[in-house]
Amino acid sequence: MIDPLQLVAHRGLQSNYPENTLIAITKAIEAGARFIEIDLQYSKDRLPVISHDDNLNRVGANANFHFHNRNRKEIINQAAHEPGRFGDKFIEEKIPKLEDILPILNNHPEVTFFIELKQETLHQKDFQDSLNTLSKILKNVIEKVVVISFDLE
């Protein structure tokens, strides 16, 4: 038996907030989560953003918006409010950059992030290239990050 029981907040506190958003992450920590799983996608300019899908079909309002065809600057200005679940309640929530979790990691030494490299991500950048990118961005907090993926080939 694990004592105390430790849970991973999958995409943050996504039962109450739009998944993979900064509000979902911070609310999960406020609720006591010590492990947060987030998903990573890459933009056309090969920069990381936090999103499960490589498009806005579920989380945004533009079904034809695909990350691999857009620069990161365009992506991070898109709402990630999950209108199908929450209407416009979280319309101000945007697709976060990976760098946006740095202050959270710095302010919460008790929290570890599991960062999932999605299949679409590894089609744009191979696994080693992705690890190099993560290492550069997360260099000061790398000990608080675990990289996971179902597609390492």
Regions found by a protein language model. Name each.
Residues 1-153:
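Phosphate-group recognition and catalysis centered on beta-loop-alpha active-site segments
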